[in-house]
């Protein structure tokens, strides 16, 4: 028996499509009954075979499913199935489907496949990457997310349909991934308006005040940013005046139609008025205008700055482009106030109306900016601060973050912003044994400061200036990187052998996908120039130790495989660069921490061992997220975030039991 699809194509009958559709309808109706689903599927197949037709129309099959559900008294499931059919018919009639490089025919089987993720992976996917579809009144399915991301990536440079289909199939089956940022924003208006939202990693040297504009903007679009605040960097900044008075106009929100999108600075006698625009650009411009007023001597006659927040949308209003809700004007007011306090405190410290900011001031300002940012209503700020080896003030910046009050530890609110960044010493030369001993002792207490070896970085790239917050990408100032990942464990076959050809092909696709991301023009010129010059790729691996455990690969075998994977990525990247006429990538491979993406296939993160044979994986979620409420109703372990009000937390934590694949785990190996 065959099936005639709406396109007219005839394909073999497969009862699994019916079983999948009935299962989804039953789950939506709360009538999930595996035995009942089997009975309905078998009854539908029997009816169709009894009709004796060589090819059955898809509509006839769906009608038969409805009839059978009613006959077997699955009334709620029948209703859910009918509503689903009606919704799909509306979508087809509206012409919403716009066929790209991936055809409807190619995608059709994936729509009916079971989700390849286990419970933890499915939860993390739904929380993190599945976008809400307002016209359908639901979140994306996995096949739709992959389609959106792959269509976006392959649109950035000429790509064959065969390559796009291979990439899609690998991502769908969790063998490899584009960056988590692209899974979230790729193919949406966000990616068109804010291309830099695709990038995981960025870095800037704070040697001019424009760097703070860029830092603020990048954090708002969701990138993690490293900042370097060495003494030599601070010396390049112009002095700041510390006698400007800031007044905050009381907030009186204007209607949406009257809001300014961009920030407006006007002058009247000795007063400047800063009307902040209601956009990411507007907020970043406001910060730039402030620094211009306190650094440019042409504004010395301005004694007062009045800040107008009326165009900023009220707290809680839905953000249509990025998703999430608005933070309101309060966070912006707090940010400007705290930055100005840093500036005026520097003047009081030095006893001067005009003074040079020190590295600790620069670090404080970067952290205050980070404190103000909640990107897309989903992700909080990710920063790293790189400081001098002899800068005790910066090194000890977080030493007194907590203090005892009436027998309880409380955070010092005046410096609470300093928790926004992890800080590392930027060693420009080899430290003495005594210095290293001291450093290790410091790390025993709080894990900080970390260290960055500039000499080692310069051997790998001559213009190395710093790194991203996770520390795995070597960057020049105004440099960024988009990361891709191959799940090595997914290429272990049932007999315990490794599918090397499939793995190497995935690495080739990973490098090509990464290079395509460098072909997108970025919205900030300084960053776009560095991007086009360096074309950095970040081809990463995950599930490595799971693969080693499963295949028994020894150290020599691992080294050989890593060499092959590196060579494959470099070759693919260089070939694509030559094909498109762009620069060959300066760097191609890396290993990132692989936190969130590794949870989708639930494999060991990056090249790390699994934590233990059995462990509890805890995942944070916003307390008001409907997904959180569903998990609570289903009886999942849901707990308030540590340190928050147990009765009314803003963040909750879900617990998932995880069983690691057989083999060595973290406790079975030494630290070296």
Residue ranges and their predicted role:
Residues 1-672:
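Extended catalytic cores of very large enzyme megasubunits
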